[in-house]
Regions:
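Internal, well-ordered domain-core segments that constitute the primary functional module
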Residues: 152-208
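Well-ordered mid-protein domain cores that form the structural environment of catalytic cofactors
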Residues: 107-176
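Beta-rich, blade/repeat-based domains predominating
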Residues: 85-97, 139-151, 184-198
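C-terminal segment of N-terminal export signals and the immediately downstream linker at the start
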Residues: 6, 26-65, 69
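Beta-strand-rich domains and repeat architectures in extracellular enzymes and scaffolds
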Residues: 62-64, 70-110
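Sec-dependent signal peptide hydrophobic core
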Residues: 16-20, 24
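Blade-edge beta-strand/turn elements of extracellular beta-propeller
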Residues: 57-75, 82-85, 124-137, 168-186
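N-terminal secretory signal peptides
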Residues: 1-11
């Protein structure tokens, strides 16, 4: 029943912290080590004073002065002209990850049903050129939102009754890993709390 399912979720959240800790501790330790290596006074940019929004540009997007938009991928088409990989339909949650060469990787969930979902990645050079596109998760369903971890992985969440959370490598080197300790339900998103060494997960369901 619904009450029984809710009770199981509460029991997991209240009593299953050891499983979550086992998943998170390795990444959190790596994050703390990396954070200690960040030099004091590292640049930080606020978005509070970026200016008023201008009229929509050619892509229909309103941006402040100095910003521009461009289309980098279209569903059903190869992002960089290579026939080897086609950008997915139904894009949803995503995040960006810095690369060592000054560029970045954008990852995007696909909310297709019936094992047609997954996660795609676009890699950009430091000058903004798109240099690679590839899949980092395949054969999953209704990948809605998720969350970036401080140790440079992407948690992709399935949004259906027995949905799972998959930890994905944005660089496409390591295979994605399902994380059963994060529960089986209609997942929405994940947030990593590095101060308290825990994860917060939201559920996309009428009863929350």
């Amino acid at each position: 029943t619904m009450d029984a399912q809710a009770l199981q979720r509460r029991k997991f959240l209240n009593m299953g912290v050891s499983g979550v800790a086992a998943f998170a501790i390795g990444g959190l330790l790596k994050y703390q080590q990396a954070l200690a290596a960040v030099p004091a006074g590292a640049p930080f940019f606020s978005l509070n004073n970026i200016g008023d929004l201008l009229p929509p540009d050619e892509n229909g997007i309103m941006l402040p002065p100095g910003f521009r938009s461009r289309v980098v991928a279209r569903s059903g088409e190869p992002p960089i002209g290579s026939p080897g990989y086609t950008w997915h339909s139904a894009p949803d949650g995503g995040a960006c990850f810095a690369t060592d060469d000054g560029g970045w990787i954008y990852v995007s969930n696909s909310e297709i049903r019936s094992n047609g979902g997954g996660v795609g990645a676009l890699r950009f050079a430091a000058n903004g050129d798109l240099v690679d596109a590839y899949s980092i998760l395949k054969n999953t369903s209704i990948n809605c939102a998720g969350g970036a971890t401080p140790w440079q992985t992407w948690l992709s969440c399935e949004e259906f009754t027995v949905g799972q959370v998959y930890e994905c490598d944005p660089f496409g080197v390591k295979p994605a890993i399902v994380r059963p300790a994060l529960g089986s339900f209609r997942h929405e998103a994940v947030a990593v709390d590095t101060l308290n060494d825990c994860l917060y997960l939201t559920e996309d369901a009428p009863d929350g």
